[in-house]
């Protein structure tokens, strides 16, 4: 009977394992989004913080690989950040990695939370525009946070507040090699509106579902019922044996 009970426990464990939750909406065409950003940028050092702020605008698109990790491509343009008379004084085109800290530490619940925090890091091509010849190229790194508010019942729209530090890695080239230098960095603060396209599941986000195989469930139910019958039969045999023992003891 002990063997039967142990086997029953294994069957129940197998049933539980076959009812695990999985995430749907993981096709390549799923979980893409497009965004527009607007805000301001100011030198990190040696300037009046608010007085030196200049406008910045940009667009981007992202692909969420998992509920935790995503990749993004972003282009930003900045106005009046240098003495240049061009419409845009600088542009920064970046490849970004994103980590959803809420899903990382508190797990994904099946749909986006109302408020979430993303950590963002990346690098890109930084270009300075001047009148006539003499445009300059550099490369940038970016570190920031996105404070996201997921709007509506369908969570199709996200409003984000995005502070970031942007480094011009070659700001003092050729005197020094590429490096992180606060004197060649800027603080950027933007607000962004993101639209999340529908996935193959019809939602605008990863869908968490439980996967069942009905044939396996029916087979497991049959096994469980057979084991229950076997346990009941063993209990009956044990009760009969106990009665016989009691009768023999009385005869003695």
Locate each region found by the language model:
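Transmembrane beta-strands of outer-membrane beta-barrel pores
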Residues: 38-44, 75-81, 101-103, 123-129, ...
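Short glycine/proline- and aromatic-enriched beta-strand/turn motifs that initiate or cap beta-hairpins
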Residues: 20-62
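Short loop/turn motifs that connect adjacent beta-strands in outer-membrane beta-barrel proteins
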Residues: 20-31, 68, 103-117, 151-157, ...
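Outer-membrane beta-barrel translocator domains and adjoining extracellular loop/strand segments
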Residues: 46-53, 82-89, 110-111, 128-138, ...
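Gram-negative (and chloroplast) outer-membrane scaffold detector with strong preference
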Residues: 67-141, 153
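Bacterial Sec-dependent N-terminal signal peptides
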Residues: 1-22
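Residues on the lipid-exposed face of transmembrane beta-strands in outer-membrane beta-barrel proteins
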Residues: 36-40, 59-63, 95-101, 121-125, ...
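Predominantly the C-terminal beta-signal and adjacent terminal strand-loop region
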Residues: 84-85, 152-248
């Amino acid at each position: 009977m002990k063997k039967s009970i142990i086997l029953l426990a294994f069957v129940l464990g197998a049933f539980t394992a076959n009812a695990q939750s999985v995430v749907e909406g993981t096709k390549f065409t799923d979980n893409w989004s497009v965004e527009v950003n607007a805000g301001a940028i100011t030198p990190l050092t040696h300037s009046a913080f608010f007085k030196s702020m200049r406008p910045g605008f940009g667009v981007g698109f992202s692909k969420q690989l998992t509920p935790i990790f995503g990749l993004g491509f972003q282009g930003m343009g900045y106005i009046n950040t240098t003495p240049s008379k061009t419409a845009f004084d600088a542009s920064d085109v970046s490849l970004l990695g994103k980590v959803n800290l809420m899903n990382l530490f508190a797990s994904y619940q099946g749909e986006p939370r109302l408020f979430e925090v993303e950590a963002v890091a990346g690098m890109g091509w930084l270009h300075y525009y001047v009148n006539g010849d003499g445009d300059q190229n550099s490369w940038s790194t970016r570190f920031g946070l996105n404070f996201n508010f997921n709007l509506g019942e369908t969570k199709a729209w996200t409003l984000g507040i995005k502070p970031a530090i942007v480094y011009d890695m070659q700001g003092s080239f050729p005197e020094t090699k590429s490096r992180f230098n606060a004197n060649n960095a800027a603080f950027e603060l933007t607000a962004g509106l993101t639209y999340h396209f529908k996935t193959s599941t019809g939602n605008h986000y990863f869908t968490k579902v439980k996967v069942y195989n009905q044939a396996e469930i029916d087979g497991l139910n049959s096994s469980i019922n057979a084991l229950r019958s076997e346990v009941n039969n063993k209990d009956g045999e044990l009760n009969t044996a106990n009665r016989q023992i009691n009768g023999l003891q009385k005869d003695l």
